[in-house]
Amino acid sequence: MKRLKKAALAVACAAVLCSVFSGCGGDKKDTAKAAPAEEKVLTVYTARSESLNNLVIPAFEKETGIKVNVIVAGTGPLVKRVASEKDNPQGDILWAADQTMLDSQKELFEKYVSPEDANMIDAAKNKTGYFSPAFADPTVFIVNKKLAGDMKIAGFDNLLNPALKGKIACGDPANSSSAFQVLMAMLYAKGKDGDPMSPEAWAYVDNFIKNVDGKFLNSSGAVHKGAADGEYTVGLTWEDPAATYVKNGADVEVVFPKEGAIFPGESVQIIKGAKHMENAKKFIDFMLSQKIQEAAGKTLTVRPLRKGVKLADYMTPQDTIALFKNYDEGWVAAHKKEVVAEWNKHLENSRQ
C-alpha cells in the first residue's frame, strides 16, 4: 500500500512539473504567438481608365472583403511616386505602364507570378517574374470609312499610297507612348528578317514620314479623334478609343495591320515591401481570372489577355489578329532611347 501511495505521489509531482516547465510535449504550440492576420485593406495606384477601375475594384472588394484605397493619377507621376516611397512604401499595387516602361526599375517591385499566368495568351505571360500583363492596348489603324471609300488600308504598305499623303494622323514617337508602339510595329513589320533596327526598317520609316507630310500630332487623343471626325482618312492609334467609336456607332473601322500587331500588356505589379502582400497577390489573381477578363471583354473596349475569353461583337475576334512572333518586349525596353534617337535623326533629316 505504501508503495502505491509513493507511486501516485511521484506521478502527481511529475504532472505539476510538466505544467511549470516547457519541456513536456505540446506546450510549444500553446505558448507560441500566432502571426497577426493581415488587415483587410489594399492601396492601389492606378492609371487605368475609370471604366476599367469601376469594373475590377468593386468586384474585388465584394468577393474578398478587402477594402481598396484607390489613388488615380497618370502613369509617369505614379511611377515617380513609387520610386520616392521606396524606403517606406505607401502603396501595395501599381496598376499602370508595362514592361517597356518599368523594366529598368525592377528593383521597385516584388517578384510574383500568379497561378492564373498559365491561362494567359503566350504573348502576355509574365516572363520577368515582376510584371503581370492583364489587358492590352494593341496598335491599330482607325479608318474613316467614308473618306477611305474603296481604298485598301490593311497594312503598313498601304500607308505609303500617294492618295493618303497628308491624310494620315500619327503622334510623335518621341513624346507619345502609343505612337512609339506604332513605330515599333512598323520597324518589326518592315525590318529585314524581323530585325527592327535594320536599314530596310528605317527606309520604310523615311517613306512613311514623307507620306505623313512630316506633320506629327502632339496629342495622342487628336489622332483617333481626327480620323473619326473626318479630318484624316486614317489614324495610327491604340484599340481602346478606336473600338469605342465603333461601339458608339461611328462610321469608322478598326484595322489590325496584316503584318502583325503589338500587344503591349497593361501590367499590374506588386510594390516592393508592400504592407499588404497577401492581399496584393489576391488582387493580381483576381485581375487575371476568367470572371474579370471575360467581364471586360464583353462590356468594355480594352482587350483581355486570357485565353478563350469571349468578346463583344464590336471587338475584333482574337483569332483574326496576326501577332509578331519575334516581338521582344525586353529588347524594346532596353533599347527605347536608342530607337527614339534614331527616329529623331530620321525626322530631322526629312526636314532638311
Q: Where are the model-predicted features located?
A:
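Extracellular/periplasmic bilobal clamshell ligand-binding domains
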Residues: 313-352
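A ligand-binding cleft/hinge motif common to bilobed small-molecule-binding domains
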Residues: 100-105, 228, 233-251
